[in-house]
């Protein structure tokens, strides 16, 4: 059974909204500045506003796994909103919302997805906090890198309820998850060789 996740990321930059928009809308360039975006491959072009575009995106992570999915842009309201759907190892919706308060641009990203990787779903009851921590690491790094690209300051990253997991818990959880996956693979391989 797929495990559902809902994430909210908020970035605040001392930069103009149009400059922030121009970087976010061009996801094909994300691998140039966002450490955890391994590749973005255009499958279908969109219109002049990128509406309808389809891309295959592969993410690396702070943990030893990758996730890939196709992402289609379903709604664009320049420079305020980009919505899309994901299909693949993650399935669901994502929404970038940009707003401006004085000289500050606020970026909110809502990511509501379920996982289709069986090992992730199997381990979710014990590893969910680790997966959530990993997501936050990816997004925090994205915010910092975007600020550098903008020559701006990332003013803060408000923390989600699952955000600041102590490092020891992450290490213990990752070790436990790795041991479980290793054991599962051993059993599967052993059964397959009979």
Tell what function each PLM region has:
Residues 32, 41-93, 101-106, 141-156, ...:
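Glycine-rich portal/gate segments that line the openings of hydrophobic small-molecule binding cavities
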Residues 8-12, 68-70, 93-95, 110:
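Well-ordered beta-strand positions in beta-sheet-rich domains
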Residues 1-50, 176, 180-194:
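Hydrophobic ligand-binding cavity/cleft-lining segments
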Residues 21, 30-34, 59, 96, ...:
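Signature tryptophan residues that serve as conserved aromatic anchors
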Residues 67, 93-97, 117-123:
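A short, polar/proline- and glycine-enriched secondary-structure boundary/capping micro-motif
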Residues 2-3, 13, 101-194:
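Terminal "cap-and-tail" regions of soluble proteins that handle hydrophobic small molecules
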Residues 7, 17, 26-30, 55, ...:
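Acidic, low-complexity intrinsically disordered regions
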